[in-house]
């Protein structure tokens, strides 16, 4: 019997202007996946789920429908076909959910990435992370019906990741300033990813597209040159944020509070309802978080929220 534990942290997709093509990882919180290797096959599939905690019973226990087990099944198929590793044993999977579901924090991507690094370690590391990330992306299809990479890629690789192309997949990791801090606030409501995608326009004007492209390019430049002022100017989303903001009570009040407290920029984390803000110091990031939480709690709905302050995670998914 051999046991390996994988960990992958929360991620923030879109990063305001980079809808479906940009995301980054933070250091905490994150999901843990514990895999135990048994020599003898138990059941029809080579993977079974023995335990899921932290999900309130919401996640499927069927290995073909749960993101973490689904990606391990795909990984095992791949190494049999492409690496000559014919796995005859059985893997028991335990998932510890530390990320809230439907939160905009890359919950499904974290589970998939953690499971994959653990499975890769268990099998003797036959794959590199660029190979593994393809399975994590497919895991998103199981979770929300769309194989988007803006959470899966940074969850696996760390840092900021730009998805230049989906067909074929072409990922570019982007370094970021050491003193760039993220404040992430999660109000205690849910926004389903599938629904948040359904409210988006199917077509946009050339004028809107041009404005969005300009912000994406400028944001990348700001990250590469540690130009915090440019980073802040570029965190403008003219496509998704206007349509998704009504799904988050008090979004503009919270955003205003963050900017007034010193944040260089603020937007919706992924599909929401979490909101993120960037600051250039941990002290400012903490002050921004307090202001955002206060803004949520003083709404008519008096929303409670959780908060995390974190630098950008440079490593990505790892074995712990």
Swiss-Prot record:
GO molecular function annotations of the record: ATP binding; homoserine kinase activity
GO-annotated cellular components: cytoplasm
GO biological process: threonine biosynthetic process
Family matches, as Gene3D superfamilies: 3.30.230.10, GHMP kinase, C-terminal domain
Its EC number(s): 2.7.1.39
HAMAP family for the chain: Homoser_kinase (MF_00384)
Functional description taken from the UniProt entry: Catalyzes the ATP-dependent phosphorylation of L-homoserine to L-homoserine phosphate.
Name of the protein described by the UniProt record: Homoserine kinase
């Amino acid at each position: 019997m051999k046991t390996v534990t994988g960990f992958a942290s929360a991620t923030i997709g879109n990063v305001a202007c980079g809808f479906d093509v940009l995301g980054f990882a933070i250091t905490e919180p994150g999901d843990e996946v514990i895999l135990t290797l048994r020599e003898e096959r138990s059941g029809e599939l080579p993977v079974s789920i023995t335990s899921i905690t932290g999900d309130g019973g919401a996640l499927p226990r069927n290995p073909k429908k749960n993101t973490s087990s689904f990606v391990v099944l795909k990984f095992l198929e791949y190494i049999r076909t492409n690496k000559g590793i014919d796995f005859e044993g059985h893997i028991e999977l335990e998932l510890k959910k530390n990320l809230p579901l439907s939160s905009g924090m890359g919950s499904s991507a974290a589970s998939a990435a953690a499971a994959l690094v653990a499975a890769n370690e268990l099998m003797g590391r036959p794959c590199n992370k660029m190979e593994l990330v393809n399975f994590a992306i497919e895991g998103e299809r199981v979770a929300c019906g769309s194989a988007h990479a803006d959470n899966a890629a940074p969850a696996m690789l760390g840092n900021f990741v730009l998805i230049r192309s989906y067909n074929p997949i072409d990922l570019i990791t982007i370094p970021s300033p050491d003193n760039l801090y993220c404040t992430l606030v999660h109000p205690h409501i849910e926004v389903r990813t599938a629904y948040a995608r359904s409210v988006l326009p199917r077509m946009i004007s050339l004028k809107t597209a041009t404005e969005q492209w300009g912000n994406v390019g400028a944001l990348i430049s700001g990250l590469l040159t540690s130009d915090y002022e440019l980073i802040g100017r570029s965190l403008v989303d003219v496509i998704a944020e206007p349509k998704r903001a009504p799904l988050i009570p008090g979004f503009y009040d919270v955003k205003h509070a963050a900017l007034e407290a010193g944040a260089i920029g603020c937007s919706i984390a992924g599909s929401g309802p979490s909101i993120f803000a960037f600051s250039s110091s941990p002290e400012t990031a903490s002050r921004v978080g307090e202001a955002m939480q206060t803004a949520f709690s003083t709404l008519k709905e008096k929303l409670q929220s959780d908060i995390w302050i974190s630098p950008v995670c440079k490593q990505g998914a790892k074995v712990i």
